[in-house]
Amino acid sequence: MRRYFDATLPVPRIDIPTNSQISTQAAFGKILDDLAKGDSDLATRIMTTSPDVTGTTSLGPWVNRRKLFARTEKADAFIEQRIPSTAKWNFVPEGQHLELGIAEMNLFLLLGAAGLSHSLFGKRIIPIGTVYDTFVHRGLDALNYACYQDARFMIVGTPSGVTLAPEGGAHQSIATPL
């Protein structure tokens, strides 16, 4: 079987404020936003995706800077209709985020496939997916197969805990094994 390799990517300095307490979810968003501001090799290789939880898992600033992927350019309907929003959903061919809708199984299938890019095509992609941690179980078959194939990706389960009041009871982590 043919396998390719790609060089290790250098990681640029990431300035993380440590002078105050911050949630891991907010820190994750700040790290990606810091990377999105630059033009490092790492930042150009990151691909993010989520099953309809982009804003609530702190990917919003990354997506605003790096745009959403689409085969052809599409305008942001909220901007066109003058609907107030912190999201700037511009779809462009060079976009680095793929929005999946509510589809956790598709999230893990995509992460697994993109996580094999270095060995299949000789070019590394750094796939990062976010999901509400209580819904990870919806994609475990695909996650298992991706791991068997030695796919390289990052899955961020957030927000965790049992105090996510605005999201409702169905989004709590009470079923997550500890």
Give the residues covered by each predicted segment.
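Thiamine diphosphate
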Residues: 1-178
